């Protein structure tokens, strides 16, 4: 298959205006902001940023000569102006509140201020772009596309919403003309992009803090679809099939009238064997080395994007066996007291259902992970945002009811105000209605949660830790304690 990109695509890659020589990111430690900052630093811009939460990302930024402010105060802007003058650009994300001190000072000085989506749009205009959107699977699909491009020796620039195993990073500054990135629909900013190849993985109501209802979200996705030179969409998604008509369809359920089909034949909770078809013609049997039927759909989407971009299937196949999930996507963290610890970013009922489905398949097929044969599913869920919890409280309860033991932590607010009557205990109450005999715990803090994990879990449990907030700190604390105990034991033995 030759590239779908038209011959006059180069005209679209018009010479874009340069950004100011110095760019300051408010909240630079975020997964999306840090990737943009690193790409711009690699392009030769002077970069600074501020973030009040310490993490490894900030350390990496500093190693790449990015100046980091550990606080967000007005004096940061003054310090930047002393060095660089007023010809600077301030970048913010939707997470930055309008009362942010740095943002207020930048407005007071009448400095140029742009949303992070405008910076991504700038980078998209410079390259042949593959932009991935959808309610679920964006990070996994864009990680797959980036991996397949890399193993096909295409060296893409990539801006990803998670850590790509191949790069051990959320970005790649490539040498080719291609850019692969996610289009975040959470705030509607994806309508600013003009992709050469657009991809929508699926579509269902999400981000209820921004969208009134499903129709509101569909309208935004239609606007994105209209701006894509070529649009690849998921035939298996009812909402997409009914509302958005793409240039190309992919499917894991159907072959007839489908451009790219990946039909599952075997699964063991660790990998999936599937038959690959193009325009109803059988091409090959391939092994997808990641678990979960939803990840097979993500793989089908990634293969479709690569083929539309003109990559030969034989070159794509080289990378398929190297596919790995990004960080916090059913990520096996290790063994803790002979219990399997797995982390997943799931924070929507459909995502939780998909993660629990993988865990169930592992148990049903008696698939061993790290020499342990898991017997029970223990879920630890941190709800993300009060608005989402209020909207999907019953759905959360229904999907969590598939577990053998459930812990629900306090809600990670993500900056939202509390909603009266909406908390971890209200989800627990709904869960009890569905499964009265299920063992459910709703601790008030992480200290109590860790205590309960030690008391209530058993050897050979598969402990699935889910959420988009800081719930990953739980596994870090468990393993840190294990390491400290080992060090103490070694000291005593010595």
From Swiss-Prot:
- Indicate whether rRNA-binding appears among the record's keywords: no
- A Pfam family this protein belongs to? Mur_ligase_M
Subcellular location, in the record's words?
Cytoplasm
Pathway(s) this gene product operates in, as recorded in its UniProt entry: Cell wall biogenesis; peptidoglycan biosynthesis
The reaction(s) this protein catalyses: UDP-N-acetyl-alpha-D-muramate + L-alanine + ATP = UDP-N-acetyl-alpha-D-muramoyl-L-alanine + ADP + phosphate + H(+)
Positions in coiled-coil regions: none
| EC class (word) | ligase
Q: Which InterPro entries match?
A: Mur-like_cat_sf, Mur_ligase_C, Mur_ligase_C_dom_sf, Mur_ligase_cen, Mur_ligase_N, MurCDEF_pg_biosynth, UDP-N-AcMur_Ala_ligase_MurC
- Give GO MF terms, alphabetically: ATP binding; UDP-N-acetylmuramate-L-alanine ligase activity
Family to which the UniProt record says this protein belongs: Belongs to the MurCDEF family.
This chain belongs to the protein called UDP-N-acetylmuramate--L-alanine ligase
């Amino acid at each position: 298959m030759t590239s779908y990109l038209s011959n006059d695509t180069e005209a679209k890659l018009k010479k874009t205006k340069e950004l100011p020589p110095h760019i300051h990111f408010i909240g630079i430690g975020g997964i999306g902001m840090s990737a943009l900052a690193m790409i711009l630093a690699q392009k030769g811009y002077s970069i600074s940023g501020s973030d009040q939460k310490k993490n490894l990302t900030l350390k990496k930024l500093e190693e790449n000569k990015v100046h980091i402010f550990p606080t967000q105060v007005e004096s940061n802007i003054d310090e930047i102006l002393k060095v660089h003058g007023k010809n600077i650009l301030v970048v913010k994300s939707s997470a930055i509140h309008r009362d942010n001190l740095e943002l207020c000072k930048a407005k007071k000085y009448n400095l140029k201020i742009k949303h992070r989506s405008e910076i991504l749009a700038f980078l998209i205009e410079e390259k042949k772009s593959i932009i991935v959107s959808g309610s679920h699977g964006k990070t996994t699909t864009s990680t797959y596309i980036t991996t397949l491009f890399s193993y096909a020796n295409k060296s893409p620039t990539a801006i990803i919403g998670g850590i790509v195993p191949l790069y051990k990073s959320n970005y790649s500054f490539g040498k080719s003309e291609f850019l692969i990135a996610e289009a975040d629909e959470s705030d509607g900013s994806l309508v600013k992009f003009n992709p050469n190849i657009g991809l929508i993985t699926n579509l269902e109501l999400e981000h209820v803090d921004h969208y009134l209802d499903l129709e509101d979200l569909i309208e935004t996705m239609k606007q994105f679809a209209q701006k894509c030179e070529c649009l690849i969409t998921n035939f298996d998604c009812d909402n997409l099939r009914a509302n958005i008509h793409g240039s190309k369809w992919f499917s894991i359920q159907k072959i007839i009238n489908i451009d790219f089909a990946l039909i599952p034949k075997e699964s063991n909770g660790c990998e999936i064997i599937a038959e690959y078809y193009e325009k109803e013609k059988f091409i090959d049997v391939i092994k997808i080395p990641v678990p979960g039927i939803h990840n097979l759909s993500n793989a089908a989407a990634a293969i479709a994007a690569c083929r539309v971009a003109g990559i030969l299937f034989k070159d794509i196949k080289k990378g398929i066996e190297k596919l790995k999930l990004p960080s916090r996507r059913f990520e096996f963290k290790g063994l803790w007291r002979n219990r399997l610890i797995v982390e997943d970013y799931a924070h929507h009922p459909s995502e939780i259902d998909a993660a629990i489905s993988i865990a169930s398949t592992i148990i049903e097929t008696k698939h061993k992970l790290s020499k342990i044969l898991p017997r029970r599913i223990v879920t630890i869920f941190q709800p993300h945002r009060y608005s989402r919890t209020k909207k999907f409280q019953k759905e959360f309860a229904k999907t969590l009811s598939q577990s053998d033991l459930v812990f629900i932590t306090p809600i990670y607010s993500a900056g939202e105000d509390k909603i009266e009557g909406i908390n971890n205990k209200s989800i627990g109450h709904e869960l009890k209605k569905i499964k009265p005999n299920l063992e459910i715990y709703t601790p008030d803090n992480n200290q109590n949660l860790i205590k309960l994990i030690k008391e209530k879990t058993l050897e050979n449990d598969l402990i699935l830790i889910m959420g988009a907030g800081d719930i990953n700190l739980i596994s870090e604390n468990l393993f840190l304690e294990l390491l400290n105990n080992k060090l103490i034991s070694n000291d005593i033995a010595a």
